[in-house]
Every structure is written in C-alpha cells, then in structure tokens.
Amino acid sequence: MNTKRMLKNIFWKIPLSPALKDGLRAKYVQKKFESESKVQDVIECIDDDEELREYSKYILSSVTRKDKQHQNYEMHDDSKGNATLIAYFLTQYSPDNHNDEWWGRGTTEWNNVSKAVPQFVGHRQPNLPGELGFYDLRIKENMMRQIEIAQNYGVDVFNFYYYWFAGERILEKPLNMFLEDKSLKMPFMFCWANENWTKRFSGTDEGILIGMENSEENYRQFIHEVIPYFSDERYFNVQGKIALQIYRPELIPNVEEIIAYWRKETIVACGKDLYLFACQSKSGFAWCAKGFDAENEWMQGSIRMQAKEITGHIKKINKSFAGEIFDYEDMVLNKKYVIKRNLGRKVYPAIMPSWDNTARRNNRGTIWHNSRPDLYKQWLKDLIQSVNSRKELDMPIIFVNAWNEWGEGAYLEPDREYGFAYLQATWEAKNEE
C-alpha cells in the first residue's frame, strides 16, 4: 500500500463529522489542483526513441484494432434468474442547459470520451462506442435499443443516477423521457447522487457548480420529489419494498429521523415501505444500524486498498503522468475483490467490467490495466455463486458499475475493440453451469 492511499484511508476513519471532513477535503483538493492545474495539459515525452516508435505504431493501429475476444451481437433466449444484475445508468449523453452554461453549447460526456489518449503502449484509450455510436439520449430509439440489448444479455435493472439539488434537477431530460414513456419496458430504480456537483466532469475537482444543501428540510423534501415515480409498474422492488439507493449516506443529517420520515411518507403515498441501500462510497460501514435495509459495495472504491498498484512498473509516455495504475488481472485471479469485512453482513457485492477515468482526468486518472471480458466473467460467476449462498441477503443482487460510464471506462455497452464481448460474458456467467 502506498503512502497516499494509506493516508486517505486514515482520513476517512477519523471520527469527525462528514460535513467537516468534506470541508477539509474540499480545501485540500482546491490547493492540490491549483498547483496541478497545468499538469493535466502538460505533455512531456520520455527520451526513449524505441518506446516512442512503439507508441506511434500503437496509436496508428488503434483505428482498426479489434481484440481477439471481440464478439458480434448474438440473440439469446431468456436468461436464467439466478441473480439480479443492477447496472448504473448515466444520463449525461444529451445536451443540457447546465452543461451548455458551464462547458459550452452541446457539451456531453462524449466530449471527454473522444479526446482520451493512451498514456502508455497497451493502454486501451480512447474507448469508442460500437453499434450504438455516440448516441443522443433525447432520441427514444436509442434508449429502446439499449433496453433490447440489456435484456438480451441478462441485465435486469437500470439504476438511474438521480441528480436533485434542493428542487433543481440536472441531466433530467433522458430520464424524464423514460419515465413518461411506458413502452420503454425496463425495470429501474434510482440512486440519489446526494453530493456537490463539481468540475470533475472536466477532470478537475475544484469549483462547486451546484452545491448539495445538507439540511434536514432538504432531505425531507427529497422523498416527495421521487415518491410519484414509485408507483410505476416498472420500478424495482426488493421483497415487495421500493428500492432506493443513497450514494453518500454519511451526509444525511439526523439520519435515523430522516429515514423514518421517508418510510412514513412512502407508506402513506404508496402503501408499501422502502428498501434502502447505502453505498459504501466514502464512509464507515454500519448503515443498517442507522435505519438502512442494506449496504452495497462501490466499485472501484471498495477494492483500491487491497489492489496491486503497478504505476511504477509501467513505462508511461508522458513523464508528467500523475495518476495511479492498478492490476485488474491480479485482482481477479487472486480474488482481491472479496471484501472480508462485508461477508456475513447484509452487504450486496458490486463488480466493474473495467475502469479508466483518464478520459476525464487525462494524465491524473486511475487506470485498471489488464481488464478483459474473460476476467470480468470469472469475477461475475464467482459473485453469482456467492450471492446465492449468502443467507443474510434478501435477494441475490449484484450491482454493476456500469451500463454506460464511458468517461470512467466502466461500461457494458458494445465498443469498437471488444464489440459485445462484455455483454456476452455477462450472459454466459448467468447461464453456464
């Protein structure tokens, strides 16, 4: 474990209030990225002619490169119901008034995706979409095809990020279209992203664009914002309870009282209770004692501390690279995704097909190198067996990060290099004996 990660781990365990921790972190981040603001745009090539020639060949071959595991679309019969796969769904793929104001007219996540460059030979960037192309989620047919593909390959639920800030929503147009059009027949749920909206979209953390108001009144009001959607016949339930996930549970003030209020109002309006998931994102892990029904792991954050870091063993082309590189293959083959403290507790596991946010953060990104569909399949098969044997879980649920987080290199959707291979691996993991 390197010193930076060790200090981060210690910081989040210090017994200070979440608000104070966030404030201290914000000050640190602002100073850190003020000093590094120019680093992201600096390209200082290594002095190795042979390596630069190999890099040039790698870049030129990327236009037509297809991996040996590449798969074309394949129709399947109904998938086995041996596990429920819930995939996170990002709606930042259509113009939005806020993004127009902050980044320029027409800016979407595709702007980040298309400008990514490999940081070393063998670094799989840019990740470019396959069949679905650089889609616009305002167009119904695009979402219809996403649903068709997801259901064909065994993805059971879309977990839409819900961005709500004291009455103001962002990235809402695609989700509104889905909610209003019942012909889009896909089970869904919400993950409330209850944190500040910052400049991370462009690869920096400093600068809050929309702040999260962490008042009791704001958190009480939130449940009234989403209750109207709970009666949708497509909304996902766990044991007859309405599923709702909270990304930053530690930011909820007087959490027991707020949760009790949410439950009361939901029962009055819908005739049934909530099933609340608390994400293990940045906080301590005892949320069932605070009123949540369960916790869930969060990839890639949940496994960073036990992963093998290989940053120093990779010859980066840009000497200014200031990110981190982890070994996905080592993590899967040695089952480092098993988080022992979560076993025996009501904590649902998570998985990521891959992870690489250099599209957003350039040479300060985090890369999980050596990710492949066959390794993802091995990991998923193991999780499916696990959730079906764990008596403490109410359902065999696995959270997948993600369906379409292209800017973070975490997606199941078809791309140019692998085609439908990750989706085929998903189907095989669920259906093979």
Residue ranges and their predicted role:
Residues 37-433:
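Glycan-processing catalytic domains of CAZymes
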Residues 1-50:
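Boundary detector for helix-to-coil junctions that initiate low-complexity/charged tails
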